[in-house]
Amino acid sequence: MPKKLIITEKPSVAMEFAKVLKITANRKNGYIESDEWIITWCVGHLVTMSYPEVYDEKLKFWRLDTLPFIPHEWKYEIIPAVQNQFNIVQSLLQREDVEEIYNAGDSGREGEYIQRLVFMMAKPNPKAQIKRVWIDSQTEEEIQRGIREAKDEKEYDSLADSAYLRAKEDYLIGINFSRLLSIIYGKKVAKEINEEKASISIGRVMTCVLGMVVSREREIRNFVKTKYYKIIGEFGNEDGTFKAEWKVNQNSEMFESTKLYNESGFKKEEDAKEFIKGLAGKKAIITELKKSKQKENAPLLFNLAEIQNECTKRFKIKPDETLEIIQNLYEKKLVTYPRTDARVISTAVAKEISKNLNGLVKGYKDEETQRLLNKMISEKYSTNLVKTKYVNDSKITDHYAIIPTGQGYENYDKLPELHKKVYDVIVKRFIAIFYPPAEYSKVNLTVEVEKETFLASGKVCTNLGYLEVLKPKNVNKQSTEKAQDVENSSSKTDVSDENNLEVFKNIKKGQEIETKNYEIKDAETSPPSRYNSGSIILAMENAGKLIEEEELREQIKGAGIGTSATRGEIIKKLERIKYIDINSKTQIVTPTKKGEVIYDVVNYAMPDMLNPKLTASWEKGLDMVAKKEIQANEFMTKLENYINSKFNKLVVKM
């Protein structure tokens, strides 16, 4: 009888496929078989790229005369630790009775790469048709749909091309420039860090991230605080008093004065005191009064970078730990695919979203969540999701945002406590998009004292809306604006207060009000914050925005450095090779002395490796290959030209 073979990336995923297909046969050595189906699995990567010395024994030694190394026929090999499982997979792929092969690897570029390497090395039965299963979750319905709608493998060839190119690019840049810089500068680095010898590890993405961390640290280290002095006026009427902050205007006697640090602060305290003296006895008039209503929608759904950043802030865990947790939730059928860059869902998913909501209502027993869901249903908040900003097919490439499936609750009680907390964060963000916007009442007020301007405002939340889901405590305090704050100021005066609204209610434009007092407030500039292990992930995702050239920035809009699947591992590697430190309690990221020395070497030898522009443009190129906008050989030619050109320039510098 003809057989159908499914190959998954992990044994646990294979078991889910077996359940869905109702295969009750006993698990054999590395696979499961029924009358119709055979299911086997990889254990992550089974095949890897060969080291240079496999090509030529001379390449075992790091010597200048063997560089640059760019093979024209690439060699691959089975990873020794998983040779047995590869043999099992290979034997199944080559069986004569297998007529259809389903590639059910992880639905992404790296998952495609893992499976394609296996197929390349195993040489499947040429008569068998190979299909690709592409799924967004591991629910029964989604697995059934994935098998039913599996497409011919050839439709994913461009994705596979980009995966091969990504691996080749990282291999060539890592091997050639790690060796070359180590040969040229290794002794100098060893001397600087007081070690007997040192190698320099270079990576397309890793080195750029090191550059971001070191640059931020040096910006902080070299920052010189500047003290300045702000003037706060206290005004009032029979309803009470309010504070307003002075700000220079074109009619002010201080306009363009060298005595000012900025538009609302003096360089010297004595000048501020002198200015206050000049205000004595002058009338205060309300010259502008603006009342407005504001609405604020719930934030977009989580992609991997956003949830990693959120979990670092909330739970002080590293990005790779967050991914591991969400991967477990995914494999337990509780959430959708984790390695996604999208923060929206598709129209098709939105039309069926009631299944997710009904599943939450029936299965998720968290008391607060049930209250929020019941309110949402009774108030009919969940209608017309398709027409909102949370649904956008054009912003989805491989997978939509991370959302709860409404299934998998048979596995929930066995989850570790931290996994439950992360799940709840995902659930709450999901529920929030169905709630109405938060609503605010706001008043902006301008007081003029002769030619001088003082500004104040008041803002209060009048309807919690989605904040009932995401910010149930101290909402008004959290949402209060700090009017006229000076950027990078660590001494901010709150002249925007919800209590001001009570004072403002009877005030009218043109009215004279009483001046109670003027005071001087000390202020000082503050340096930028250090990255933590979550915010550096977001910075990597948005690295394209750091590019100064507007035309290029627009050209590679949306390109980050690394991918959602790899960013956490890159941070982990930088820490492992002791280029950065991550504080276990705060998750604050700082460079080590070794990391800074390596940065200086790279900054001298090949500074473009530290610039997000280069890395983001390479990533954009890989994306263009996947989308069939350029050919794989075009990308490879550019890569080889870059390596040869950069190598020649570095050798001249020796």
Report residues per predicted region.
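Metal- or metallocofactor-binding catalytic centers and their adjacent structured scaffolds
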Residues: 256-300, 308
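Conserved PLP-enzyme active-site core in the AAT-like
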Residues: 206
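A conserved hydrophobic secondary-structure block that centers on an alpha-helix together
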Residues: 310, 314-318
